[in-house]
């Protein structure tokens, strides 16, 4: 079954928020118009309608459209009122149905603020936490951070709806919490958690481990790219004493230090030095820890950056009810479909343009044969 057909099946389980009296348009049709128009460059409800009207004959090949193309008000109202948790569940089920994650896959968890989606009278913009499969380049799921809370409470909820068995979960220092580590282990996965000043006692104990330990495994890598040379040294300790006194971190087996030095070849910029620390339930070689930790930044470069540059997410002004969260899911469905299409060797922006121009290529992105 194609990704698009599986998407239709999953969408059929979504609760329709509308009254069943005098419905003119099918929920499935509205949702698929949203997905396809976003793939092809639409950024507003009005643009979705304009695109769908210009491609009505194309849409009729796989949609019912009993009363033609829905209006802008209808599309706005539907995406604003769909329960965002229900939509997030559908999204996660769809990803699970079209992908098989390899054992030991690194899944990065990180948050992003949708800066344009700030409602009048609200203190802050909407903040989403997403899960990114680093090797497969797929968004696995997302969850909204409650306005009166933070990522610490949202991350366990996201982990519970994902299938993370045998995966390695990487999270920045915000997620370095004992309950989060326990949730990961309870779901048969492993963790690599960044440690900073928010866990001051733990950080001090890790400093002591590297100060006094005589059994440290190291791996050094050197990369030259974009006019700079970066040297990284990954140091690993598995036989530690000081950290054990810090409390019960579930299945904690390894402490890690990454020292990086960045030198600029043709610039007056000074050399940049940084040291970062991590705890992990994994028992890997130093080289594998270095690789896993580096891959975490794929969620910044391949997801957050692409959503901003390729989809212009930060400029979105969708504020009504659940519109911002649900539109964010649309973007991630579109991103996954575009990344899943491997024949076109260009960036997301270029793929979106081609999908809008070329119906044959759009069918390829959707995995449809009509």
Regions found by a protein language model. Name each.
Residues 196-295:
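An anionic, glycine-rich sequence signature occurring as long contiguous blocks
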Residues 190-195:
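Short hydrophobic alpha-helical runs that function as membrane-insertion/retention elements
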Residues 14, 55, 306-370:
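A short, flexible helix-boundary coil/loop motif
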Residues 2-21, 312-313:
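Short amphipathic alpha-helical segments and their helix-coil junctions
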Residues 90-93, 106, 218-221, 303-309, ...:
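Short coil/turn segments at secondary-structure boundaries
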Residues 258-339:
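A C-terminal functional module that forms or caps the active site or interfaces directly
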Residues 10-13, 20-171, 176-179, 344:
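Conserved, well-structured functional cores that handle cations and Mg-NTP chemistry
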Residues 181-189:
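Short, surface-exposed basic-aromatic patches at helix termini and helix-loop junctions that form
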């Amino acid at each position: 079954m194609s990704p698009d057909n599986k998407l239709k099946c999953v969408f059929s389980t979504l609760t329709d928020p509308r009254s069943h009296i005098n419905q003119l348009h099918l929920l499935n049709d509205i949702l698929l118009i949203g997905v396809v128009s976003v793939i092809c460059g639409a950024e507003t409800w009005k643009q979705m309608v304009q695109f769908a009207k210009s491609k009505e004959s194309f849409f009729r090949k796989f949609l019912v459209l009993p009363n033609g193309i829905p209006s802008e008000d209808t599309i706005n109202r539907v995406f604003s009122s769909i329960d965002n948790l229900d939509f997030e569940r559908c999204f996660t089920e769809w990803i699970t149905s079209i992908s098989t994650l390899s054992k030991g896959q690194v899944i990065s968890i990180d948050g992003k603020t949708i800066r344009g989606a700030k409602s009048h009278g609200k203190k802050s913009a909407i903040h989403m936490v997403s899960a990114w499969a680093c090797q497969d380049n797929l968004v696995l799921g997302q969850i909204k951070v409650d306005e009166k809370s933070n990522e610490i409470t949202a991350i366990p909820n996201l982990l519970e709806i994902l299938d993370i068995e045998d995966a390695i979960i990487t999270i920045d220092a915000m997620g370095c919490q004992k309950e989060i580590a326990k949730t990961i282990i309870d779901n048969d996965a492993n963790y690599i958690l960044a440690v900073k000043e928010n866990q001051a006692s733990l950080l001090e104990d890790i400093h002591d481990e590297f100060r006094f330990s005589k059994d440290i495994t190291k791996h050094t890598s050197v990369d030259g790219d974009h006019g700079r040379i970066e040297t990284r040294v990954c140091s690993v300790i598995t036989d530690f004493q000081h950290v054990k006194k810090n409390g019960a971190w579930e299945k904690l087996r390894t402490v890690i230090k990454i020292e990086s030095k960045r030198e600029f070849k043709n610039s007056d910029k000074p050399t940049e030095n940084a040291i970062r620390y991590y705890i992990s339930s994994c028992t890997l070689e130093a080289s594998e820890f270095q690789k896993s930790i580096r891959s975490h930044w794929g969620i910044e470069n391949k997801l957050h950056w692409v959503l901003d540059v390729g989809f212009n997410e930060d400029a979105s002004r969708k504020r009504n009810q659940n519109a911002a969260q649900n539109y964010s899911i649309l973007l991630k469905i579109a991103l996954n479909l575009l990344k899943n299409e491997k024949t076109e060797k260009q960036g997301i922006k270029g793929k979106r343009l081609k999908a809008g121009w070329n119906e044959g290529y759009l069918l390829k992105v959707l995995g449809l044969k009509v």
